[in-house]
């Protein structure tokens, strides 16, 4: 990462909201990174953070195996903000007392602010916050003073101005906390004196230079899928090394309608990228014949992709690097509480490449979130319909065709899915929804068309709202829009005579049907 920008170090104790803290800070144009709570003091000194934040977590600090920090952390002179468990670890480590609460506090609560300086600067007398804790602080360490309380939590926020340590028993990073961003702003800019010097324009400049220095005269191969991450990576890397980038686009016969044509048009024709297009649709469909089990479908597709990709990669000379669109959440997921030695997850398409293909990985986005990658895509003039494209499963339409996969059933689903996406866009809903798509079911139903009886396939429509795909709510789409989608599919797609709408949330259902 660039050395000339201010950085915030977030020590992770296992909170479900830790990534949200990072995102909130980056939205304020300050760079932040998450690392496990047990990183060494030497690592912290070398990282040179402008501020340190201790995240929440599910543990109780007084338990023997609870995550702890080196007490030297509090003597470094760096500003520290503890959130929820982070507050409790500060109190416990510095001589205060934490016990199981008589009354747990979950959900919204009203804090009374007793000190309107530091993190509560420009606040009113009270504020609604989001609590999530089963332990409470009974006494605070020497040098700390109370700055906020609730009816159930006498010590809801404390500070030690001399040591520049602040701690709060609630979550400012969640939307349920009113003025939560203001608390983070006060900490970053009034207390830590951070500069707003993290932006995608400077990242692009830095990364182009880094890619050139890293790659040298070697060629780079990238599996282009047409999705957001690989598309933006392709354009950024091409900007750095030009024709040294070789993109391999495999048509597995399970893509969205006309997707192969669109990918070739955008990347080969508009961006002049060296694109190798492989039509392996027959090969994939032959291998999938008679396969109905979802996991088996994934295995067959994964194996075939690796085989096709390998065949094409071997034809390219002087390859030194394999580029992937790995994102920061993948990295966090792999290294957080388990320690930095954990293996980083690989992209599903290339994770199984043979070991004799000794390429180094080139991952330009491994420190970025999806919204930051989209911002880069816009800066690089990628079409908005690619930048804001909804997530699409790696195995493609194979996991949206329940039962047998045939060329005919793929074409039926492509047409139905194209209608769903088209009408969702017309209604102005596409960017508001996490995903919206059609599923072809392995059942037929009786219908009537004109004077005749029909016995054709059933199509389900799925649309969900989500932030991170970990949880999702089914979208309450206007009945008129659903009616148009249903009528168009039944009238325009030969082979479907009934459309149903999926009203399942995640959990208990998953977003995809398989």
UniProtKB/Swiss-Prot annotation:
E.C. designation(s): 6.3.5.2
Annotated ATP binding sites: 225-231
SUPFAM superfamilies: Adenine nucleotide alpha hydrolases-like (SSF52402), Class I glutamine amidotransferase-like (SSF52317), GMP synthetase C-terminal dimerisation domain (SSF54810)
GO molecular function terms listed in the Swiss-Prot or TrEMBL record: ATP binding; GMP synthase activity
NCBIfam families, per the entry: guaA_Cterm, guaA_Nterm, PRK00074.1
PANTHER family: GMP SYNTHASE [GLUTAMINE-HYDROLYZING], GMP SYNTHASE-RELATED
Record's protein name: GMP synthase [glutamine-hydrolyzing]
Gene source species: Brachyspira hyodysenteriae (strain ATCC 49526 / WA1)
Highest classification ranks of the organism: Bacteria, Pseudomonadati, Spirochaetota, Spirochaetia, Brachyspirales
Gene of this entry: guaA
